[in-house]
Amino acid sequence: MRVNNLTPQDLKAYGINDVQDIVYNPSYDTLYQEELNPGLEGYERGVLTNLGAVAVDTGIFTGRSPKDKYIVRDDTTRDTLWWSDKGKGKNDNKPLSQETWQHLKGLVTHQLSGKRLFIVDAFCGANADTRLSVRFITEVAWQAHFVKNMFIRPTDEELVGFKPDFIVMNGAKCTNPQWKEQGLNSENFVAFNLTERIQLIGGTWYGGEMKKGMFSVMNYLLPLKGIASMHCSANVGEKGDVAVFFGLSGTGKTTLSTDPKRRLIGDDEHGWDDDGVFNFEGGCYAKTIKLSKEAEPEIYHAIRRDALLENVTVREDGTVDFDDGSKTENTRVSYPIYHIDNIVKPVSKAGHATKVIFLTADFGVLPPVSRLTANQTQYHFLSGFTAKLAGTERGVTEPTPTFSACFGAAFLTLHPTQYAEVLVKRMQAAGAQAYLVNTGWNGTGKRISIKDTRAIIDAILNGSLDNAETFRLPLFDLAIPTELPGVDTHILDPRNTYASPEQWQEKATALAKLFIENFEKYTDTPAGEALVSAGPKL
C-alpha cells in the first residue's frame, strides 16, 4: 500500500534528479523478490538459505569504518560536539568543512540520480515525544531490508504526511577520488551534517553504518535534553523490574538480554527518560559466529524468512556454516524484534532500571562478577574497558585491550562526562545498583561459559548476589561474591585460574597501569579527579 505519494519530483529537493522509479516502504515479500533477482550482480545479490533468511555479502567492509567518519563543524556543532582534535580524549568525530561536505553530497546525489530507488521511512526511538523520523534512500534492496528490520516500522496512519527529521543517503557504490587533497582518511566516507540533518555514506556497503549513524545522532540530541542515551540492551522481569546491559560489540548484550524468563525491550540502543527505559530500534542485530541452537535458541530461531544474514558462509545446499569465520568474525543477522517471542509489546519500553550491568570481555584479570560502589560505577562507565573483539571494526583481527568511554565511544558525539552525569542522575533517582560482569576469558585461556554467565546474571536479577558474602580483589578493590547458585565457585576469584597468584598479580598490575593511564584524560575536571580513587591502585 502506497500511503505516501512520494514522487521523483520530491527527491529533487535533496539534489537527486531523474529518478526512474521509487519503491516506497517495500513489503518484506517485495524485498525478498528484489534481493533474489537473478539479474543482480556483485554485492547487491542475495542468496537464499535453508533457514528461509536471505544472506548477503557486504564486501571488504565487514564492520564499521570509524576512521572514515566525519561531522560538519559549523555553528550548530562547534561548541557542543566532542571533537577528535580538541581535548585529551581520542574519538572518531573528525571535523569536516562545509566545502568538502558539499563535494561529498554531490557525489552521493549524483550516484542516486537516474536510478530506481528504495525509500524507507521509519522511526528511531520508541517514545513519540523524542523519536526521530528518518528517511533512508538507497539503490540496494537489501540495504532497504536492513533498515526495515532495524528501525521502528510506522503504521500506515503514521506514514500519512510523514515528515522526515533526518535523511540518510546511502551511495555505497560511489567513492571520493579527491580524498587526499581534502585531507581525508580514504576514498570512503560516512559524513554527517547536523544542521542540514543529513547522513551521507560512500564506498562502504556495511549496513551497520546506517544503524550506528542514527545512534550517533540520538547520542547528540537526547543528553542535551537530560535524557540518557545508552549503548546497552535491556529487558524486564515478571514484576516489572528493568535491567540494562552495557557493553561493546561481542561482549554479550544481545545474548544475555535475550532471556526466556524476561521480556526483551531491545538489544543495543536505548534511552532513559522520566518515564523509564525505551528502545531506539525495531529490530536486533546479533553476532552469529559459532551460533548454535543449543546455546542461543532464541536467536537461532529468529533466523527465518525476513531475517537478513551478513557475511556468513552458505554451502551449496543452502545450509549455513555458522562456525566459519573466514570472511569475518563479525558475521551478523538482523531481524525484526518480533522474531523474538518474549518481547515487550506493543511498544518497546518499560519502567526505570534497577540493575545496571557493565559487560566486559577481559583476559583473565577481572572477576566474572563484582558489585560496584557509586564512584566505581562512574569510573568503570567512563573507562569502558574491554578487549576489542575481532571483526567488529575494519582491521581488527586479534583481541586487543581497549577503553571505550561509556562502552560506546565510537558513537558518542558529546563529551563522555555528559553521558555519565545523565546516567548517574537516572540511577540515583531509581535507586539502581551497578555490576561489572566479565564475559571474557580466565587465566587458563578458556572463555567463561554462557551457562556460568547466565547464572551470574540470574543472581544479579533475583537479588541473591546483593545478599552474598563478598571479599575484595587486590589492586582493583572490587567486591566479589564468595559463592553464587549455579556458578562454579572456583572461577569467581580470577587468581584461582592461574598456576600461581603471582602470575595473576603480574597481569593485573599491567592492566591496572592501563586503567590509570586511560583515566588521566578525565582528571582535568574536579569531578574526574575525584573518581581516580575509585579505580585501581598500584
UniProtKB/Swiss-Prot annotation:
GO biological process terms on file: gluconeogenesis
One Gene Ontology molecular-function label: phosphoenolpyruvate carboxykinase (ATP) activity
Presence of keyword Lipoprotein: no
* Superkingdom of source: Bacteria
Q: How is the cofactor bound?
A: Binds 1 Mn(2+) ion per subunit.
Q: Which residues bind Ca(2+)?
A: 149, 151
Catalytic activity line of the entry: oxaloacetate + ATP = phosphoenolpyruvate + ADP + CO2
User: Member of which family?
Assistant: Belongs to the phosphoenolpyruvate carboxykinase (ATP) family.
What is the official name of this protein in its record?
Phosphoenolpyruvate carboxykinase (ATP)
Native organism: Salmonella typhimurium (strain LT2 / SGSC1412 / ATCC 700720)
